[in-house]
């Protein structure tokens, strides 16, 4: 999107693995889903296999979407990438995946947007993200012009059947409860 810089120097290997969705702007393909995760693994063709998973509390079942992603530019001499990818879950149709904030030291959190300011996600390596970091990312998104007042804070509930959480982080005092 206009006036938003993507992160450069992405280490693709370090980016792989499971990410927990902390917050998102609403869109129909994730509506009503809790316990949302994105799992990234290397494909044989050099791309990334994307497995998105979320629990539909109304239907009481897990929904999965499997897709593929590719960096838009060739790697730099240090084998890192610009954080612009294309992602597809529906055949030849690709959407934008832009990494606009990242904990570059440890890859513990990331903020992603789509082709415009209607799509925004905050992801973490753990089911909870500390309040100061979450607040920093929301503030940054707000400065970029995203409608942060419309963010949905995802319920990462370990009581859902077949929920696989890695490390649990306790909610800090004063953190607002996720929308139900």
Task: Please tell me what each predicted stretch does.
Residues 1-180:
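A beta-rich soluble binding module of mature secreted/lumenal proteins
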């Amino acid at each position: 999107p206009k006036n938003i810089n993507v992160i450069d120097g992405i280490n693709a290997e370090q980016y792989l693995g499971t990410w927990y969705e902390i917050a998102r702007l609403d869109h129909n393909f994730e509506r009503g889903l809790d316990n949302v995760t994105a799992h990234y693994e290397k494909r044989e063709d050099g791309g990334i296999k994307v497995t998105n998973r979320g629990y539909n509390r109304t239907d009481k079942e897990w929904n999965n979407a499997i897709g593929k992603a590719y960096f838009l530019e060739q790697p730099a001499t240090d084998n890192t990438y610009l954080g612009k990818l294309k992602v597809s879950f529906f055949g030849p149709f690709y959407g934008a995946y832009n990494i606009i904030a990242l904990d570059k030291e440890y890859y513990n959190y990331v903020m992603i947007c789509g082709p415009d300011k209607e799509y925004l996600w905050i992801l973490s390596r753990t089911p909870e993200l500390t309040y100061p970091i979450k607040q920093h990312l929301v503030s940054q998104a707000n400065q970029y012009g995203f409608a942060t007042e419309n963010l949905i804070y995802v319920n990462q509930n370990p009581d859902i059947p077949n929920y696989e959480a890695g490390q649990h982080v306790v909610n800090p005092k004063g953190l607002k409860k996720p929308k139900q």
